[in-house]
Amino acid sequence: MKNVKTKKNKDGNLVLEYDKTSGMYITLMTSDSKLSNTNERHRFIKKTESIIRKSIQYKAYKKKIMDSGINMCAVLGNVTNEKAKVEMHHGPIFTLWDYVEITLQYLYNNNLPISTFRAADMILSDHFDDLIQVVMVSESVHKAIHNPTNNTLKIPLESAWGNLVGYLEKYKGCFDYKHFAKLNDYLELNKTNTDFDLFKTKITEWKDVKMPYEILKIEDIRHRQ
């Protein structure tokens, strides 16, 4: 979204700011692009997802996360890899499909060669830069999250690992209405959750790693003027 900007607050943290002087701009593929065809675009995204999930780097990143102490199910709490299979879920806001879409738009916006391997390499690099939000969950919980009938199981933002604001800063101008609506709806949904506060500065700390970031109130980043 081109009407979402970032700026540093008094503490030096990057925060999101909605520019009310501009309208909503949705960046789309041009009609002469092969990937403007829905079937071709979906085939591209699925292939990129497959390359990522099967890569050595992807497995190495999951190991890095689990070795750092993030090795328990974010929902069930006491379930570790020793008791049941713990999997890495992309969320709670953006899925791996979303990340491929956003990366694809970035390549297009910057007139860069578009290929599944280039997109996969960028997304894997973003994983290791801790820009991609992931949540560790048990296999059964993971299946429940992806169940299309599920409308109650939501993962708290504080349970995720990854710098959301840093990602939005890097890829500003590459989000379409669907992505921004996901962000908006998730924050709106969790505004009433009393278990955690989404609207204050967050310090995500796992062992010796500290990553501060701030999530603005929903009225500051809503997608309508």
Predicted regions and their residues:
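Cys/His/Pro-rich metal-binding microdomains
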Residues: 74-75, 135-139
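A boundary/linker detector
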Residues: 1-82, 95, 172-225
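Short cysteine/histidine-rich zinc-coordinating motifs and their immediately flanking basic loops
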Residues: 83-94, 148-160
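Residues immediately flanking
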Residues: 91, 140-141
